């Protein structure tokens, strides 16, 4: 089997179950318009995150890595009216684009964008007592994933779901000699996850329009 069949099946599934309305399509289109990288989750992955948030009955969600707000919109739509989502974005330009997309989706009152380095904002959230969060989605720069996860634990409660994207890196995580920072970060994260007694966890391989990668899912004990 080749990548083409995986992409075709991905489109087949999204046509049936991953419907994108005008707000989601606009968020996708805003990437090219703003000269931003096309690295958002796919429609099927967005729907998957939304379903996970619903399964958690999440009222309080934390996201690391906003980009244009595409995954933010998917997850925020799973919140009850009194729910909230805090999303962290390093690049002010990206945050501004995301804010427009979130406003267009009618989620202004539920979503707060915090701009700056996640590794700096996470301790602030702990100090503010912003947690515990019901669901935490990590989709930011890969080298500090392990540190992000440790802070995520401090912002969690028993039962919190922590999801981390891009942890397979097209299978490159099998190469222990890789010098790519993102691969090294993913390998370190995956090894930590396998040894972490504070969570029950697994990793799902994923193929499709985003090619070959994977998501880690961990439930805090």
From Swiss-Prot:
Domain of life: Bacteria
PROSITE patterns per record: SAM_OMT_I (PS51682)
Transmembrane segments: none
InterPro entries in the record: Cation-dep_OMT, SAM-dependent_MTases_sf, SAM_O-MeTrfase
Cofactor(s) in the UniProt record: Mg(2+)
Catalytic reaction(s) noted: a catechol + S-adenosyl-L-methionine = a guaiacol + S-adenosyl-L-homocysteine + H(+)
Gene3D superfamilies, per database record: Vaccinia Virus protein VP39
Comment block on domains: Undergoes conformational changes upon the binding of S-adenosyl-L-methionine and the metal ion.
Quaternary structure and interacting proteins, as annotated: Homodimer.
Protein name, as recorded: Catechol O-methyltransferase
Organism taxonomic ancestry: Bacteria, Pseudomonadati, Bacteroidota, Chitinophagia, Chitinophagales
């Amino acid at each position: 089997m080749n990548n083409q069949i995986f992409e075709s099946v991905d489109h087949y599934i999204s046509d049936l179950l991953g419907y994108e309305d005008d707000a989601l399509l606009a968020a996708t289109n805003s990437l090219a318009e703003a000269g931003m990288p096309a690295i958002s989750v796919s429609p099927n992955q967005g729907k998957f995150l939304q379903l996970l948030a619903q399964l958690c009955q999440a009222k309080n969600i934390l996201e690391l890595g906003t980009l244009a707000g595409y995954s933010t919109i998917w997850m925020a739509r799973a919140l009850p009216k009194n729910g909230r989502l805090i999303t962290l974005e390093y690049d002010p330009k990206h945050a501004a684009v995301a804010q427009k997309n979130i406003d267009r989706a009618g989620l202004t009152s539920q979503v707060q964008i915090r701009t700056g380095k996640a590794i700096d904002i996470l301790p602030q959230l702990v100090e503010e007592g912003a947690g515990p969060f019901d669901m935490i989605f990590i989709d930011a720069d890969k080298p500090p994933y392990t540190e992000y996860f440790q802070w995520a634990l401090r912002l969690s409660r028993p039962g919190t779901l922590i999801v981390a994207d891009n942890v397979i890196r097209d299978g490159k995580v099998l190469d222990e000699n890789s010098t790519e920072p993102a691969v090294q970060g993913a390998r370190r994260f995956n090894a930590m996850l396998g040894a972490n007694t504070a969570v029950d966890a697994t990793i799902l391989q994923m193929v499709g329009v985003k090619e070959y990668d994977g998501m880690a899912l961990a439930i805090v004990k």
